[in-house]
């Protein structure tokens, strides 16, 4: 993909415009910024974590950033290329609610087996709590990752089998306004 070129080839721009919710001009602008920050044309896990640390200076986002990195890194080569970056950004910032929920499901399904187990969710929720640090005051019933996961599973795990399917996750998330709101945070920002 033209590693350190400051412009993408027209056919690449066209393809990314088809695969995302961005215009050709927006794709070019994002590429310019991506190459400025990642001259090699790729972003590794350490660089990704560094970006998260800028956004969450009062907590430790390392663990959460690693989980997000793994979802962005579609081809699992340990690096995020621009096409992976822009497609994930498109879903998280401008995707439909169902697209965002499928993306979030992939984030929580750490072993990619098609289910979110209690332990997988606990890993992610714990990482989120570490990331936000003491900057967020949580209600008593959610002031630990374990309590939050218990509440989520009580609401979403309809067949009580200890794991969530994509359908259970989507339906449960849509029924909880706070989850829908959290997924909409990026709307309109890009």
Swiss-Prot record:
Location relative to the cell: Golgi apparatus; Postsynaptic density; Cytoplasm, Perinuclear region; Cytoplasm
Membrane topology, record value: Lipid-anchor
Region listing for Ancestral calcium site 1, in residue ranges: 36-47
Binding site for Ca(2+) 3: 157, 159, 161, 163, 168
One MF annotation (Gene Ontology) recorded for this entry: calcium sensitive guanylate cyclase activator activity
Coiled-coil positions: none
Binding of Ca(2+) 2, residues: 109, 111, 113, 115, 120
Chain ranges of the EF-hand domain: 24-59, 60-95, 96-131, 144-179
Outcome of mutating residue 84 to Q: Loss of magnesium-binding
Annotated InterPro entries: EF-hand-dom_pair, EF_Hand_1_Ca_BS, EF_hand_dom, Recoverin
Top-rank lineage group of the source organism: Eukaryota
Residue ranges crossing the lipid bilayer per the database entry: none
UniProt keyword list: Calcium, Cell membrane, Cytoplasm, Golgi apparatus, Lipoprotein, Membrane, Metal-binding, Myristate, Repeat, Synapse
Residues that bind Ca(2+) 1: 73, 75, 77, 79, 81, 84
Other known facts: Fourfold reduction in calcium affinity for NCS1/FREQ in the presence of magnesium.
Self-association state and partner proteins as the record states: Monomer. Interacts with KCND2. Interacts in a calcium-independent manner with PI4KB, but only if myristoylated. This binding competes with CALN2/CABP7 binding to PI4KB. Interacts in a calcium-dependent manner with PICK1 (via AH domain). Interacts with ARF1, ARF3, ARF5 and ARF6. Interacts with IL1RAPL1. Interacts with RIC8A; interaction is favored in the absence of Ca(2+) and myristoylation of NCS1 is not required.
The family this protein is said to belong to: Belongs to the recoverin family.
UniProt function note: Neuronal calcium sensor, regulator of G protein-coupled receptor phosphorylation in a calcium dependent manner. Directly regulates GRK1 (RHOK), but not GRK2 to GRK5. Can substitute for calmodulin. Stimulates PI4KB kinase activity. Involved in long-term synaptic plasticity through its interaction with PICK1. May also play a role in neuron differentiation through inhibition of the activity of N-type voltage-gated calcium channel.
Domain notes: Binds 3 calcium ions via the second, third and fourth EF-hand. EF-2 and EF-3 bind both magnesium and calcium, while EF-4 binds only calcium. At the resting state, magnesium is bound to EF-2 and EF-3 and upon activation, both sites bind calcium simultaneously while EF-4 is the last one to be occupied.
Descriptive protein name: Neuronal calcium sensor 1
Source organism (scientific name): Rattus norvegicus (Rat)
């Amino acid at each position: 993909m033209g590693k350190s070129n400051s412009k993408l080839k027209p056919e690449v721009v066209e393809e990314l415009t088809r695969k995302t919710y961005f215009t050709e001009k927006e794709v070019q602008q994002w590429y310019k910024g991506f190459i400025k920050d990642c001259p090699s044309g790729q972003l590794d896990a350490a660089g990704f974590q560094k970006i998260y640390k800028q956004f969450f200076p009062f907590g430790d986002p390392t663990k959460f950033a690693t989980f997000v990195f793994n979802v962005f890194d579609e081809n699992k080569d340990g690096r995020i290329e621009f096409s992976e970056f822009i497609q994930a950004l498109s879903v998280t910032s401008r995707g439909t609610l169902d697209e965002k929920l499928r993306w979030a499901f992939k984030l929580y399904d750490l072993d990619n087996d098609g289910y979110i187990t209690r332990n997988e969710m606990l890993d992610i929720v714990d990482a989120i709590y570490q990331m936000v640090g003491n900057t967020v005051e949580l209600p008593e019933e959610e002031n630990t990752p374990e309590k939050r996961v218990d509440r989520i599973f009580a609401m979403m795990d309809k067949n009580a089998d200890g794991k969530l399917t994509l359908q259970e996750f989507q339906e449960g998330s849509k029924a909880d306004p706070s989850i829908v709101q959290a997924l909409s945070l990026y709307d309109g920002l890009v």
